[in-house]
């Protein structure tokens, strides 16, 4: 064969392969509905060094969430021995009191999945009792007192997170698999359901919606100042942004894709990666904690891996990737103060579990 013929043949082959790859990638993206966008990196990346904050108490076993308002900080202990919530003075973190007593009496909690601190009022979620409880600060501000309990509608399947939308409404993920979110009034009654799980797994949509909903478990946060509700998946790498002021919805999928799972006895068993573990919507951005560890690696290490994520991913209020922070600790929960350029985080691996990062 003449050299020109060989060159022509190679050119045609490369052109065909390029066209095939283009069609394949384009087809992959077209499988998703409109409003689904993909990202593979961040325009900025920085390393952050954590400063350990020493506590004057050793109460915390698994500090899962932290929220701060004014001169008060609350840390939620997912596996608390006696109480699930602990109140501290901020920024010194002197221990003040505990709340959310563990037990099965009417005034005690079987579990605490999350809590919200807003306008000097605390709301807690007990999934096992299917209850939301409001607590107010005492006159001294050094303790929290139960004010009311809201029993959730039976149509709301095992709520694992919640956000406060306004004085009359909560938003809770829908674990039936039929929709994405439930809107619930202050009496615990279901108002309606909105959205759908943005998956291309047609088989799961047809035959295993509850398992699909389990795999798509997401953590929520809502900012009433800008009307942005963000949901991030515990498995895979999916960020959903709902603008509740103009009813727009944007979905961003990272390089690890949507949650991967297999169905076993009606339950969704994870097979991909651990994704996000916390999210906070500030006035200007969306901050998330990302793990990115595969379940194969977790099983292979047999508990030797640190628990948590060592990345903080920052997105715009439209879900565009802005910055990736690489941490020197593995963390679970965060609280971000953009005014002071400070991130307070929880580390479940250490006896001193509260960290401070400066990103200014």
Predicted regions and their residues:
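A short helix->beta-strand "capping" segment at the edge of beta-propeller domains
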Residues: 34-61, 320
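Structural signature of eukaryotic scaffold interfaces centered on beta-propeller domains
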Residues: 63-67, 113-117, 160-166, 210-226, ...
């Amino acid at each position: 064969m003449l050299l020109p013929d060989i060159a022509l043949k190679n050119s045609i082959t490369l052109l065909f392969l390029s066209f095939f790859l283009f069609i394949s990638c384009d087809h992959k993206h077209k499988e998703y509905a409109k409003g689904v966008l993909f990202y593979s990196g961040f325009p900025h990346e920085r390393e952050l060094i954590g400063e350990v904050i020493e506590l004057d108490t050793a109460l915390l076993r698994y500090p899962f969430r932290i929220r701060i308002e004014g001169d008060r900080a609350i840390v939620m202990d997912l596996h608390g021995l006696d109480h699930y919530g602990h109140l501290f003075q901020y920024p010194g973190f002197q221990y003040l009191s505990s709340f959310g007593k563990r037990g099965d009496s009417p005034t005690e909690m079987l579990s605490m999945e999350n809590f919200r601190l807003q306008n000097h009022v605390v709301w807690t979620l007990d999934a096992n009792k299917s209850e939301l409880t409001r607590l107010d600060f005492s006159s001294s501000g050094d303790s929290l007192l139960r004010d009311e309990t809201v029993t959730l509608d039976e149509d709301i399947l095992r709520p694992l997170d919640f956000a406060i939308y306004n004085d009359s409404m909560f938003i809770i993920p829908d674990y039936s698999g039929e929709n994405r979110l439930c809107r619930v009034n202050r009496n615990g009654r279901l108002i309606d359901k909105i959205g759908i799980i943005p998956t291309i797994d047609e088989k799961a949509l047809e035959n295993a919606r509850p398992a699909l909903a389990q795999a798509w478990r997401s953590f929520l946060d809502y900012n009433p100042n800008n009307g942005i509700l963000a949901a991030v998946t515990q498995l895979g790498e999916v960020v959903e942004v709902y603008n509740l002021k103009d009813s727009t919805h944007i979905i961003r999928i990272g390089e690890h894709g949507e949650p991967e799972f297999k169905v076993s006895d009606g339950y969704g068993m994870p097979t991909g990666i651990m994704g996000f573990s916390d999210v906070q919507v500030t006035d200007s951005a969306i901050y998330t904690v990302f793990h990115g560890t595969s379940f194969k690696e977790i099983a292979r290490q047999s508990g030797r891996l640190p628990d948590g994520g060592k990345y903080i991913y920052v997105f715009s209020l439209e879900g565009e990737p802005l910055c990736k922070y690489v941490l020197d600790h593995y963390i679970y929960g965060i609280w971000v103060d953009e005014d002071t350029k400070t991130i307070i985080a929880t580390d479940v691996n250490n006896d001193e579990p509260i960290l401070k990062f400066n990103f200014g």
